[in-house]
Amino acid sequence: MDNGARPLRDAKFFLVVRFWIAPGGEPQVFRWLEGGHIAEVLRQPGFLWVRRLKGTEPDATGWSAHAMIYGIESRESYDRYMANSALHARFKKERQPLEAKMRIERFAGEVDYAL
């Protein structure tokens, strides 16, 4: 996994995975993420780095807020990743035991370095 040595500016595209974890669910969710899921995503062509964030406040239901930000070489690399139906089917199956403990939403786009 990237240890932060790659410059953030290498990324021209990004994927943000926002997720909320039920109280008591963090150990199981983090075991899944750190046990291979993050590394598998970073092995995809064009994926450069990842950063994990933890929100300071839980949501209204008490679930903790988190996000993963993936830096990606290009829109084409992102599109290839999203088109990999076998990979996403496997990820979905791996997440099934976590469904009651985790809510996920995603968004992606171009990095604006003009700001």
Feature roles, as predicted:
Residues 25-52, 90-91:
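Short amphipathic alpha-helical segments
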Residues 7-13, 60-62:
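Short, flexible turn/loop "capping" segments at secondary-structure junctions
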Residues 53, 105-112:
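Flexible, low-complexity linkers/stalks enriched in Thr/Pro that connect modular domains
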Residues 2-7, 54-58:
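Short beta-strand/turn micro-motifs at beta-sheet edges
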Residues 12-20:
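Active-site-flanking beta-strand signature of metal-NTP-handling nucleotidyl enzymes
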